[in-house]
């Protein structure tokens, strides 16, 4: 049956309204984005993300750390702070992101994941769009934005992970951690097979142990998934890390020359040393990619 002009106009309006609901305002993106993930909890993901952010901040960069482990965030605990606003306030109460940031050591800006239930499942499309708009604004204000994702991969975390320029997978030399990291990569490539994925191996006795663990993981990924991952580096198994956690002081602050601190400094340099050129060559910005996911959800 042929649509009359009235029906066509109504259909067009509906499509435009839907598009307006899901497309955020796009600011000029300045920041480079990194999503940090792990296959399971307990591998030191949040600790590495925090201290790597501090290493970048120490080099004079403007860094924003976003704790997207909603309701289970560790950044406040690791810093020894109690934030007045969390990501939950931004997501549920439409509080502006930049006004909700806390200030950590070395002037690091961050937003806590908060505590309580995961609220992302309760977000409607308008709240998603509001949050994306806030992120777009933040990306124009910082040099680097690091997303500390929750352990495992939930449906609501995927858009943020897949939209980032780089994905850093944290694992340890333990066989179970290696297998969990493989499962995380498999889940990602089944959704999107053109991703920039790098691996950092935590709690290594020496560089060789980190390289050996990466080699096992990389071989398995290549054999069964036919994709490549890159070695970002390893982080030394250092007693200063557990002491810093107990004292609620980032180990990069507590002991800047400790083995673990030197490791995250090298890791940060390795991750971002060549990103300037590649960042300019990217066809889509973080927000453009995220918007496409929002359109699919609508």
From Swiss-Prot:
Q: Which UniProt keywords apply?
A: ATP-binding, Bacterial flagellum biogenesis, Nucleotide-binding
Pfam hit, one: ParA
Question: SUPFAM superfamilies recorded for this chain?
Answer: P-loop containing nucleoside triphosphate hydrolases
A single Gene Ontology CC term: cytosol
Q: State a single Gene Ontology molecular function.
A: ATP binding
Which Gene3D superfamilies does this chain map to?
P-loop containing nucleotide triphosphate hydrolases (3.40.50.300)
Residues bound to ATP: 39-46
Sorted alphabetically, the Gene Ontology BP terms of this entry are:
bacterial-type flagellum organization
Q: How does it assemble?
A: Interacts (via N-terminal region) with GTP-bound FlhF homodimer (via NG domain).
Q: Quote the function comment for this protein.
A: Involved in the placement and assembly of flagella. Activates the SRP-GTPase activity of FlhF.
The UniProt entry's sequence similarity note says:
Belongs to the ParA family.
User: Can you say what this protein is called?
Assistant: Flagellum site-determining protein YlxH
Query: What is the species listed in this Swiss-Prot or TrEMBL entry?
Result: Bacillus subtilis (strain 168)
What is the taxonomic lineage of the source species? Bacteria, Bacillati, Bacillota, Bacilli, Bacillales
């Amino acid at each position: 049956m042929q649509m009359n002009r009235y029906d066509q106009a109504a259909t067009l309006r509906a499509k435009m309204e839907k598009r307006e609901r899901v497309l955020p305002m796009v600011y000029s993106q300045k920041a480079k984005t990194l999503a940090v993930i792990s296959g399971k909890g307990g591998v030191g993901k949040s600790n590495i993300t925090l201290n790597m952010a501090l290493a970048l901040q120490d080099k004079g960069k403007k860094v924003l750390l976003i704790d997207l482990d909603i309701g289970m965030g560790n950044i406040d605990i690791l810093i020894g702070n109690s934030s007045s606003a969390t990501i939950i306030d931004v997501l549920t109460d439409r509080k502006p992101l930049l006004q909700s940031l806390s200030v950590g050591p070395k002037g690091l800006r961050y937003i806590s994941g908060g505590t309580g239930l995961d609220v992302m499942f309760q977000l409607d499309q308008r709240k998603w769009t509001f949050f994306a708009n806030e992120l777009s604004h933040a990306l124009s204000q910082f040099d680097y934005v690091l997303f500390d994702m929750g352990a495992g991969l939930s449906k609501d975390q995927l858009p943020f992970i897949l939209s980032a320029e780089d994905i850093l997978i944290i694992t340890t030399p333990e066989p179970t951690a290696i297998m969990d990291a493989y499962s995380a990569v498999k889940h990602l490539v089944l959704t999107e097979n053109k991703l920039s994925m790098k691996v950092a191996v935590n709690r290594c006795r020496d560089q060789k142990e980190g390289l050996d663990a990466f080699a096992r993981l990389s071989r398995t990924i290549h054999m069964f998934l036919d994709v490549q991952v890159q070695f970002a580096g390893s982080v030394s198994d250092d007693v200063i890390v557990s002491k810093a956690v107990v004292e609620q002081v980032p180990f990069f602050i507590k002991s800047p020359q400790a083995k673990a601190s030197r490791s995250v400094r090298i890791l940060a340099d390795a991750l971002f040393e060549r990103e300037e050129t590649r960042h300019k060559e990217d066809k889509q910005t973080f927000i453009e990619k995220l918007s496409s996911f929002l359109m699919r959800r609508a």
